[in-house]
Amino acid sequence: MVSLKKKSKRRTTRLRSRIEKKAAESKRKQKRADKKNPQWKSRIPKDPGIPNSFPYKDKILAEIEEQKRIREEEKLARRASGQVDAAMEEEDAVDENGSLMISKIAEAAQASNPDDEEEFVMEEDNLGEAPLLVDSESYEASVKADTSRKAYDKEFKKVVEASDVILYVLDARDPEGTRSKDVERQVLASSAEEKRLIFVINKIDLVPSEVLNKWVTYLRNFFPTIPMRSASGSGNSNLKHQSASASSTISNLLKSLKSYSAKKKLKSSLTVGVIGYPNVGKSSVINALVNRSANGRSAPCPAGNVAGMTTSLREVKLDNKLRLVDSPGIVFPSSDSKDDLYRLVMLNAVSSTKVDDPVAVASYILQFLSRVPGQLERMFQRYELPPLLNTSDIDTATDFLVNIARKRGRLGRGGIPNLNAAANIVINDWHAGRIEWWAEPEVINEKNSSEVQDTQIVTEWAKEFDLNDF
């Protein structure tokens, strides 16, 4: 029996297109109906979050934010370390090529004149000499094992002993607050008599010209002082100094260091140590000098708006005559009082997470602003707040934070303002530089005239670096 042929599934194009249109329209109608259906639920389970009735909700949220911040810092540090490793590999390749070239020249010189062999070898050693400050692997292991104050003090002493010139970086908004006389005494008491100390006032774009001139005049009574604008300026900065741009100040500092190195006729390269409080811009100064000396070179030191970005010694070679050493920021508190801790948090030298009472830090900031006329009013204008009626410091701080909490929606159950959340807003804006502030230098009188250095010494040091251009 002959088998029947199977029926063909072939259809006309007209029928096939009509079926496709019907199917698409049906899917579109179903999708529209699903959107209108109030019983529609996502397949992904939604996190209900922390209930408002939970008593420790603020602490848990703070811990979550802190963990996020730590992860971001670790990510930035890993990225920066990768860039540094790449830069170091490039330097090693350049050094290898240079050493090969030197060896070839030495062979040619020896063949032409054998008597000059010893002199040439000495010059070659001087070109390649680099003071070994610290073994990076052993230092990282020691820091992981012990990150206490003693460990950082030990590294600070290494920087001072190994450096010929010390650049003490200060914040232009409060140079006296970011200055430690203990550091100056340790530098002057070091074994090397030829060691020089220079004040570098960084972040000058955040203060008016009149205030900057006062601070430069005041600090030059102690040590040679240089105003510096290491970065191109923050987005919140609206204070411009036409005579002190970033390129001009960096170029002048680089010329001064090279001039001092040429006058001293050092056999090895000049080692410049950069020290200062956390978050004053030490790494930014080094990155600016590197970028200026080597056109377009990537930044070798990680820099950021968070205190403690630099955790180990970092040596950067500019050329055969100049080396820079970046050091971790070390805090030298004057006392163990709460006010001194609040002052360090205000300077962003210590993280605000180290303080249990952010309201006290915000109150300290308000007290600081009230000392300089007009600064407290400018901060009220920034937050668009009306003038406060209370006269006492405690009442003023409380009313200020209550207004901030209401304006930013930081309210708890029953509409009660969350003062801690409002204080954290103020502290974060302060650290980010969104609030303008600066301190005024004190007048030198008989009480503090004993701390002033010898005028002749300061003048001689300034001449050695040709600092008359600043």
UniProtKB/Swiss-Prot annotation:
Domain of life: Eukaryota
Coiled-coil boundaries: none
The keyword rRNA processing belongs to this UniProt entry's keyword annotation: yes
Ranges of Basic residues composition bias in the record: 1-16
Region listing for Disordered, in residue ranges: 1-56
Entry's localization field: Nucleus, Nucleolus
Keywords: GTP-binding, Nucleotide-binding, Nucleus, Protein transport, Ribosome biogenesis, RNA-binding, rRNA processing, Transport
Cellular component GO terms held in the UniProt record: nucleolus; nucleus; preribosome
Domain called CP-type G: residue spans: 153-333
Residues that, per the record, bind GTP: 202-205, 276-283, 326-329
GTP-binding recorded as keyword: yes
CDD domains (UniProt xref): Nucleostemin_like (cd04178)
UniProt-annotated stretches for the region RNA-binding: 405-415
GO terms for MF: GTP binding; GTPase activity; RNA binding
Any single biological process term in GO: rRNA processing
Amino acid composition bias (Basic and acidic residues), ranges on this chain: 17-27
Gene3D superfamilies in alphabetical order: 1.10.1580.10, P-loop containing nucleotide triphosphate hydrolases
Effect of gene knockout: 20-40% of cells exhibit morphogenetic aberrations represented by irregular, uneven, or overdeposition of septum material as well as septation and cell separation defects, often resulting in pseudofilamentous or multiseptated cells, suggesting a failure of cytokinesis in those cells. Cultures of null mutant cells did not appear to exhibit a growth arrest.
Protein family per UniProt: Belongs to the TRAFAC class YlqF/YawG GTPase family.
Role this protein plays: Required for optimal growth. Required for normal processing of ribosomal pre-rRNA. Required for nuclear export of ribosomal protein rpl2501.
Entries under PANTHER family matching the protein: GTP-BINDING PROTEIN-RELATED, GUANINE NUCLEOTIDE-BINDING PROTEIN-LIKE 3 HOMOLOG
Domain notes from UniProt: In contrast to other GTP-binding proteins, this family is characterized by a circular permutation of the GTPase motifs described by a G4-G1-G3 pattern.
Protein name, entry field: GTPase grn1
Originating species: Schizosaccharomyces pombe (strain 972 / ATCC 24843) (Fission yeast)
Gene from which the chain derives: grn1
